[in-house]
Design a protein with these regions (language model features):
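Inhibitory N-terminal propeptides of secreted protease zymogens
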Residues: 2-128
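C-terminal subdomain of the subtilisin-like protease fold in secreted/lumenal serine endopeptidases
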Residues: 254, 258-265, 276-277, 394-432
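Extracellular S/T/G-rich loop segment that most often corresponds to the catalytic His/Ser-adjacent loop
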Residues: 170, 306-394
Length: 432
């Protein structure tokens, strides 16, 4: 059973320790009031990461959970201490625990009396998981590419994606990226991906995860140059966000007629159970005919399910290696992964400045960037599939669900033994 411990670092790879410490410090140093972030571990190492002092509860069990925890009923709690109870989405509430009780203790007692899945931690979600913990963005830190480098895979020569709206939940769009890179022209920024002030000597630092959303949008646009893409900064705290906050934001987007929700998320959960707030959001999404959700499988190199990709209603994308014929060493895999697409050494738009590596074995290494980068991960195989779906929609008149099913059928028809269903950019020659 996973449990929180101050010794969670014991036996955990330095790579994973660096990633978690980065997130913990970022939450602690954020300007708004944020809960303390902790790691739970199991026999293999870190199991999941979550917010201490608050839990998510299914609404139909709320009064029973309050009774188990020795709390007053929902009405009294709302009347006396309303700040301790917040609606996340219909069917799920966020409960702030009494000061003396930990999340681990509270959930152990709730599960003992009501079983698993009634209440869960408020999990920390990050941009497309790695490191054996379902955390942190791509499979590698970004590598420099010259500014005049062309995208790889290349920009298709047609106008695919016209009339298709894609909501990209990521780290936002870098200021000026849509002007600096022709294939990003017209991409909308719901939120920007801000760079910090320059350091003395004119050095522009690039923080961890900055530029991730711009790179993903660039890959997507190479597949569907005419698609309407709205990039939002959902992961402003070191590439991470709490499940409760993210789902509240996503619920508001359901009213805007989005065709494809592209979520750059891959996270592990307590007992590998579904994220209950996301579960309710997906139910709401599927009430809208034709809309779909797509997410990366994550970069832990194992078959353990990551969320939200493991939900039946989500199209989940793994990564192919550089030969486009084998499974990338870092990609997650298994029956819950729907399709694989190229995800190693892609080249696309990025920030200009100095990036200092924060993950072993390159910790402290400074890398200079000029607006383009080479990057690997399921974060970047996923927008290839999203772009192919959008391009098919504009070509055939199908809605997103119909286009996705047709492409998944195509992927299954060309499945590679030992890998699985595969989709490749239709305009790009397979590497030798």
């Amino acid at each position: 059973m996973p449990e929180e411990t101050e010794n969670w670092r014991d036996g955990v790879s330095q790579h994973a320790v660096d990633e978690i410490d980065c997130i913990i410090k970022a939450f602690r140093g954020s300007s708004d009031r944020r809960p303390e972030i902790k790691a739970a571990r199991n026999q293999r190492g870190v199991d999941h990461v979550y917010a201490e002092g608050q839990i998510l509860v299914r609404a139909e069990y709320l009064d029973r959970v309050l009774e188990i925890l020795g709390e007053q009923g929902e009405r009294d709690l709302q009347a006396n201490t309303p700040e301790r109870l917040r609606r996340v989405i219909g069917g799920v509430a966020l409960l702030t625990l009494a000061d003396s009780r930990t999340v681990s203790d509270a959930l152990d007692e709730i599960e003992r009396q009501l079983g698993r899945g009634v209440a869960t931690p408020d999990h920390v979600l990050t941009v497309a998981g790695r490191g054996g913990i379902g955390l942190a963005c791509p499979a590698t830190e970004p590598q420099p590419a010259y500014f005049d480098a062309e995208p790889y895979p290349a920009v298709t020569g047609d106008h695919g994606g016209a009339g298709v709206m894609i909501y990209l939940a990521d780290t936002g769009l870098l200021d000026g990226a849509d002007e600096a890179h022709r294939w990003l022209a017209g991409v909308q920024a719901d939120d920007m991906d801000p760079l910090p002030p320059m350091l003395p000597g004119g050095v522009q630092p690039i923080p961890p995860y900055t530029g991730h959303g711009t790179f993903v949008a660039g890959v997507m646009r190479c597949m569907a140059p005419a698609a309407e893409i709205v990039v939002t900064n959902c992961f402003s705290v070191a590439g991470s966000q709490l499940e409760s906050d993210l789902v509240t934001k996503l619920e508001d987007e359901l009213k805007h007629g989005v065709d494809i929700f592209h979520l750059s998320i891959a996270a592990r959960s307590r007992h590998d159970l579904p994220l209950i707030a996301f579960e309710q959001w997906l139910k709401r999404l599927h009430q809208t005919k034709g809309s779909i959700c797509i997410a990366p499988a994550g970069n832990d190199g194992h078959r353990r399910p990551n969320w939200p990709g493991a939900f039946p209603g989500v199209i989940t994308v793994g990564a192919l290696g550089g030969d486009w014929h084998s499974r990338a060493s870092f990609t997650n895999f298994g029956g819950w992964v729907d399709v694989y697409a190229p995800g190693r050494d892609l080249i696309n738009a990025y920030a200009a400045g100095t990036y200092t590596c924060h993950v072993a074995p390159y910790t402290g290494q400074a890398r200079e960037f000029y607006g383009m980068a080479k990057w690997s991960g399921t974060s970047f195989s996923t927008p290839i599939v999203t772009g192919l779906i959008a391009a098919r929609m504009s070509r055939t008149g199908e809605n997103a669900a119909q286009a996705a099913e047709a492409l998944l059928a195509e992927a299954r028809s060309q499945a590679i033994p030992g890998v699985g269903p595969v989709l490749l950019p239709h305009h790009q020659v397979r590497p030798d």
